[in-house]
Every structure is written in C-alpha cells, then in structure tokens.
Amino acid sequence: MTLLLRWVLRVCLVLAASIVLYVSVTAVQVWLTSRQTSENHANAIVVFGTAEYNGVPSADLEARLNETLALYQLGRAPLIAVTGGKQPGDLYSEAGVSAAYLHIHGVPLSKIVVGGGSDTYQNVQSITPGLQDRGVKTVLVVTDPFHEDRAMAILTTFGFSPSPDPTTSSPITGWATVPYFAKETIAVSAGRLVGYGRLSSTSHPSNP
C-alpha cells in the first residue's frame, strides 16, 4: 500500500468516524429535547399540523390540538397559530381543520393565526407575518415529542423564543417512535449543516 493510499484511507476513516459521532450526538439531543416540557407562559402557542382525513383530524393531530386547548384554557398563551397545507387531492388543509377544531371547542377565530406549508420550515414561514404583526416573540411549541427539536430550531431561526410543550397523548408511542426519531435525527443533522431553509427548498423546489 502506497503512502498516498494510506493517507487517503486514514482521511476517509476519520471522516466516517466524525460523521457517526456528529449524527450520534444529534440523536441524543433530539431525544433529550423530546423529554422536555416547559411551564412557561408565552405570547402564543404554535401547533404543528399533521394528517387530516376529509376535514377530520387524525388521532395524532387531535392529540396535538387537545394539548393546545389545555394550554390555552390554562391561560398559558392568549393566541394560537396553526400550520399545515393540503396533500394532493385533499379538500381541506391541516391548518384549516385545526382552526375549525379549536373554534368548535371554544377558541375565538380572532385568537387563531392560520398558516400553511408543506414542511416544518414552511409551516413556520407561513405564520411568521401574522405572529410578528401581533408582536409575538415567545411561543409554546406543540407537536409530537420527536419533532420538538427541529420545530424549535426553525422557530429560533425566524426570531422567536420557543419553549417545548409536546403532546402527552400521541398515538405514536413505544417502538413505533423509532423511525420518527431516526427521521428527525437525519433532518436535524442535515439542517444544521446546510440550513433548514435550503433543505426545504431542495425538498420542495416548486414552493416558495
């Protein structure tokens, strides 16, 4: 083996080890964040959308919305922002279904900021103007535990100060969360390196 080949092999091994270490540390951080719950008050609650079925919230979305209602009813924040767009062929957006659910359960429409978006970055991007117009700086973040780290990181890039309040009644539990934690670890690892905005543009090139 030539000296050059040995050097190349050594560099490759160091690079591979660095990548494994970086992803491993990120995985631990995503997991640790998932276990955090704040007791803070804030200017607004941001609840991230997920699947709806013909205008009816999925079990996961309903769990997030019920967590949001509990926080709102406790007076933890006076305003709620809902997010999530439409899947191809859908009649309703995730945000629209969320807003309707909250309103039916007693939240005035004037207290709901409706956004959209195809991913977490676009979700936050869609609600930022409405929140900024109302002077919102601090937010409580309602989503599944495994999604908290990325959601809060993106909210921070838009100038908000987030606190975690993950749903405690998600239907995704136990071993079923493993692929979700893996996905979030990859997304956070990539987002930190290239930027969440660039990652979103790559994933959804036709969207702003």
Question: For the regions a protein language model found, what residue spans apply to each?
Answer:
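Short, highly charged low-complexity linear segments
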Residues: P78-L79, A182-V188, S206-P208
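A structural signal for short, hydrophobic/glycine-enriched beta-strand patches
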Residues: A27-F181
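N-terminal type II signal-anchor transmembrane helix
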Residues: T2-T37
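Short, surface-exposed patches at the edges or C-terminal ends of soluble domains, predominantly
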Residues: T168, Y196, H204-P208
